[in-house]
Amino acid sequence: MRTFRRSLILSAGVTALALTVAGCAPAGDSEPAAPSDAAIESDGELTLYAGRDEGLIAPLIEQFTEDTGIEVSARYGSSPELNALLLEEGENSPAQVFLSQDAGALGSLANAGLVSKIPAEFADLIPAGFTSEDDSWIGVTGRARVIAYDTEKVSEDEVPDAVDELTDPKWSGRVGFPPGNASFQSFVTALRVLEGEENAEAWVEGISKNSPVLTEKNGATLDLVNSGQLDLALVNHYYWYEDAAEVGADAMRAQLKFLPGDAGGMVNVTGAAILAGAEGDPDALAFIEYLVSEKAQQFFVENTFEYPLLPGIDAPEGLPELESLVNPELDLSDLESLEQTQELLAQYGLL
């Protein structure tokens, strides 16, 4: 496991940040690139907008501060909320890094010209398909959309293999999801990208007429299935694994069905972007490097049960191979049309 320490290197009046890696770090690791025009001096502080649950991310941020000496001021919220805030703040945002629950919000900011490029030495660590093509943001972890089902009410064979089947009247009042959640909105965006606007709207209209149970968060939706109050839920895979780690898999009334290749089973990523106003900032660069380090990737495996994106790190036990779930026709960089998806959901009363 890698250990980090922060050191400020002064050369000819130019300040750059270096993260010295000790122990078993693989050969070829490089220091963050200094800005090409005028280097920015580190002040040892970082302002982070985090679109992830504080209980999950705060321990990693604390470890980052311990390892680097960089203090982090974090603002937490949902990824859609923070995306909207960043668009409103524009170039005047105090944020230096945005950590998002999904690729769509990151793409939206990139489209607005509000992010700076991730240095190649970091971006190239993550396999193509799980990070932006133009290095406007970097993938951190992977997660799969799944259908959670109540094993006491629904057999695995009865669970649909595709989300299109959920508009069938037989599922009326039996399906739940959090429409305000970033991952759900990215799924609907993926539906628009893969199946076209007309088919996506037909699905949204159909599911809205099927009396869905609308919730605030993925975890709360899964809880309804586990307690026998809901038959099916559209959630991210790792919520089930978090609960199973606490109570044991055998105690879980809910089980999961993965949907390889279907828009409803899409693989999305959490990711991070450096805001345009923080271009070349050494503390922002240090945080990006930390997120894709072996240490942080292992943290996500052990604590959030997500897929690591850094090659060589094993996924949590029991998960299908990530590559087996990926739809090759879906480019995560195409999920940037978040506002159109929100408008579609609002049109049919889901937001």
Regions found by a protein language model. Give the residues of each.
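Secretory targeting and sorting signals
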Residues: 1-28
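Short, low-complexity, disordered segments immediately C-terminal to signal peptides
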Residues: 24-43
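Extracytoplasmic ligand-binding site segments that recognize negatively charged/polar headgroups
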Residues: 50-58, 77-81, 87, 93-230
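A ligand-binding cleft/hinge motif common to bilobed small-molecule-binding domains
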Residues: 104-108, 231-253
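Periplasmic-binding protein-like
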Residues: 143, 173-179, 204-208, 213-215, 250-276, 290-314
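A bilobed periplasmic-binding-protein/Venus flytrap-type ligand-binding module shared by bacterial periplasmic
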Residues: 146-153, 192, 268-280, 299-300
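An extracytoplasmic/periplasmic, membrane-proximal ligand-sensing/linker region
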Residues: 198-200, 306-351
